[in-house]
Amino acid sequence: MRFAIVVTGPAYGTQQASSAFQFAQALIAEGHELSSVFFYREGVYNANQLTSPASDEFDLVRGWQQLNAQHGVALNICVAAALRRGIVDETEAGRLGLASSNLQPGFTLSGLGALAEASLTCDRVVQF
């Protein structure tokens, strides 16, 4: 079965993103296809390259990045929500005249069209 996940909670502070990550791992372990994860609202904080959890905590941001690298899962973040919360890639940083970018490698700024496409092409869309 083909799945897409929508994450609306930040990497730290709530259980949403952590539960979504564990669900993603379980899907793959059970042989399902996870085509994409769409980060929306506060979920865009999962793509912030500048997070630095304590050394004894799981690094969820890098966990998502590894999911992308190892399994080819698309990690799309809503561009409008990201810009409002200070998450920018190099292109947007240049366009906005910002000194640097902070989008974690493996993540892509996307519009809501990416979520709509996932909704149409996947068997299930699960929101956390």
Swiss-Prot record:
Record-listed E.C. numbers: 2.8.1.-
GO biological process, one term: tRNA wobble position uridine thiolation
Top-level enzyme category: transferase
Classification via InterPro entries: DsrEFH-like (IPR027396), Sulphur_relay_DsrE/F-like (IPR003787), Sulphur_relay_TusD/DsrE (IPR017463)
Subcellular location: Cytoplasm
Active-site residues annotated for this sequence: 78
SUPFAM superfamilies, per the entry: DsrEFH-like (SSF75169)
GO MF annotation: an example: sulfur carrier activity
Alphabetically ordered keywords of this record: Cytoplasm, Transferase, tRNA processing
GO cellular component: sulfurtransferase complex
Subunit (UniProt): Heterohexamer, formed by a dimer of trimers. The hexameric TusBCD complex contains 2 copies each of TusB, TusC and TusD. The TusBCD complex interacts with TusE.
Reported function: Part of a sulfur-relay system required for 2-thiolation of 5-methylaminomethyl-2-thiouridine (mnm(5)s(2)U) at tRNA wobble positions. Accepts sulfur from TusA and transfers it in turn to TusE.
Family classification: Belongs to the DsrE/TusD family.
The name this protein goes by in its record: Sulfurtransferase TusD
Gene expressing this chain: tusD
